[in-house]
Amino acid sequence: MTELALILVSAILVNNFVLVQFLGLCPFMGVSRKIETAIGLSLATTFVLTLAAICSYILQRYVLRPLDLEFLRTIGFILVIAVVVQFTEMLVKKTSPLLYRVLGIFLPLITTNCIVLGVALLNANRAEYGFLEATTQGFGAGLGFSLVLVLFAALRERIAIADVPAPFRGAAIGMITAGLMSLAFMGFSGLIRP
C-alpha cells in the first residue's frame, strides 16, 4: 500500500509528466486559456490515461510478451489508445454535449497526446510493475496532468487581464509561466528517494 502511495505522489508531484518529463505539452499550451476547458480536458485525459494504462498492461503482459511479439508494442499501444479515446469521446458526447462541443478537436487529439503513449511505454519498461502499480502510475499521471493544466489555466486567466509588456504577450508569457511552474515543481524532487 505504501508503494502505491509513493507511485501516486511521484507521478503527480515529483516526476510530473508535463513539467519534469515534458510530455503532453501540446494540450498543456493549447487548452489552458480557460479553466472550464482545462478541467474538462483534464478529466477526459485522466480517464484515458488510467484506462490506457490498464489496457496496455494487459496487452503487454498477456499477449505480446507470451507470444514473443514485443516488437509490436508501440503499434499495439497506439491501437489500444485510439480505441480508448474513441470510447471516451462517445462517453463525453453522450453524457455532456456541452463539454463535447467546448473541447472540440482536442478530444480526438488525446490519441496523439504523447503523455498517453509515454505512460504506457514507461509502464511496459518497468518489469517490477504489476497491474496495480501500472494502474496507479496511469491514474497518477492523469492527476498530475490535471493539476498542472488547471493551475496553468488559472494563471493564464489572471495573466490575460494583467498589464503584460508588449514583447512578452502571447506565447512568450505562457512559456515563462510554464518555466516558473516547472521550477516550482522541482522543489518536490527530494520528496521521494529514487
Swiss-Prot record:
Stated role: Part of a membrane-bound complex that couples electron transfer with translocation of ions across the membrane.
The name this protein carries in UniProt is Ion-translocating oxidoreductase complex subunit A
What does the record note on quaternary structure?
The complex is composed of six subunits: RnfA, RnfB, RnfC, RnfD, RnfE and RnfG.
- Does the record's keyword annotation contain Translocase? yes
Report the main location listed first in the record: membrane
Give the EC class as a word. translocase
Q: Name one Pfam family in it.
A: Rnf-Nqr
Q: Which spans are transmembrane here?
A: 4-24, 39-59, 71-91, 102-122, 135-155, 172-192
Q: Which terms under GO biological process does the entry name?
A: electron transport chain
Question: Which GO cellular component terms are attached?
Answer: plasma membrane
E.C. no: 7.-.-.-
- What family does this chain come from, according to its entry? Belongs to the NqrDE/RnfAE family.
Q: Where in the cell is it found?
A: Cell inner membrane
